[in-house]
Amino acid sequence: MKLKLIAYGLISCLLFFLSKGSAIAQAQNNKVSDSSKVFALQDLQEFVFKNHPIVKQAALLSDAARANVLQSLGYFDPALKAAFGRKLFGHSEYYNHWTSELKVPLWLAGADLKIGYDRNVGEYTNPETHTSLSGLTGIGLSIPLGQGLIIDSRRSTLRQSKIMVGYAEAERIKQINAVWYNAVKDYWNWYYAYRQYQLINEGVRLAQQRYLAVSGQTLLGDKPGIDSVEANITVQDRRIQLEKVKIELQNARLVLSNHLWSDKDTPLELPVDAVPQLAAASKVDRQVVDTLIRQAADQHPELVKLRAKSGQLAIERSYRREMLKPKINVTGSLLSKRRSFDTYVPDYYDFGWSNYKVGLEFSFPLFLRAERGKLREVKIKQEQLDYDLQQSGRVIQNDVMTSYNDLKAYESQLAIQIKNIDYQQVLLKGESQKFDLGESTLFLINSRESKLIDMQVKREEMIAGFQKALAGLYYKAGTRQNQD
């Protein structure tokens, strides 16, 4: 009897210190969590949009498109050209040629303004091009009256390149949205892995505490030895589970680190003591979804890209229609011996309607098979694009509604899961009370507790799934949710 009282005293002291130790350990854990840096979704947003290589690469798309516009503007750059040739043989000057011209392409009517100076002298110079020693100055225009009057290749190229700036901007937004969506999914996977680890770790702590308590009662003879064995098995099972989720947490942290870069373009790694922000499932109103659908119809990157292609094909179609016209180019120049404005030149050698040079060029393919075939090809591409635009708009709208339905399903499931967790906690508490009275078994307590942990893990999985579905809702609408 005396030994039994001593054993009871030792067990009471052991349980007292265990409870104190667990309380201290819990306080220390809370202190660590409090002191650890909370890596919020807003922090991730700052890293991604500021330093992510793909985001920086996407910005180059718009720069490249503007570079193409600049390149297309080069077709309208004024050009200066000159040529000189001279031949002397046997004390005779066969020819002395000097030709120079400033050509200024004009947007209007596809014309070219030409200012030139020619000096062709010598004993054997062609009479058609022979000039006086002072040479001839000419100012004139080259105008296409048929093909190229409404639109030509250089105007078509410039217009198309300007439209492609909008295409490139839409592609930039699309790539940035994709990067952010993947980052958000990885963040909530990390959140789930972290919460799962916390819950399983708490389960290990509870199982160890129960094992020590049951072992003490077994020594006193109040509990059969098999209960101690069962409690130890539960501890080991949960430790195995803890090691598994520990690896999952490490992997999730590494995957999230893929999105972290410094401002010096060096990769960063998420600190081990970093913890995710607290999360809950907030309700999404149907009004928000309707707004996203309307916004997607106007601004979704895929639709913007298709509309840009449609505009590009419309310009190409106009150009191909222009190619069906005959080519009629008229050139004309007013001529003068004047080399500068401060020199005297007789009126009959100065600029006037009696001193000119004019030319006409005409060509027209009889069957126009190449031109008609190209125009037909452009029309077919336009029809294909119209069908693609129609289908893409419908798919985007249905994708947004699908994400909304997923969110509503998560809301309902979470509400039920939270109630079930409350009920399970009541069951566990009641089972523990029955066990203390000797009316239950350790197996039932472990089962109730394991079920509770599984339900809590499932709740965190639902919360993470809800947050990923919310990010997917905005992504499928062609935008993203700011974390301000």
Where are these regions (language model features)?
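Sec/SRP-type N-terminal targeting helices
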Residues: 56-60, 73, 108-134, 146-171, ...
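Gram-negative outer-membrane assembly/targeting C-terminal domains
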Residues: 26-30, 465-484
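Bacterial N-terminal signal peptides that target proteins for export
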Residues: 1-10
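Small/polar, glycine/serine/threonine/aspartate-rich low-complexity segments that form flexible
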Residues: 27-36, 83-143, 274-285, 318, ...
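Periplasmic alpha-helical coiled-coil/stalk elements that build and connect Gram-negative outer-membrane
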Residues: 170-292, 406, 410, 451-452, ...
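C-terminal segment of classical bacterial N-terminal signal peptides
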Residues: 15-24
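Bacterial Sec-pathway N-terminal export signals of envelope proteins
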Residues: 25-97, 141, 146, 150-156, ...
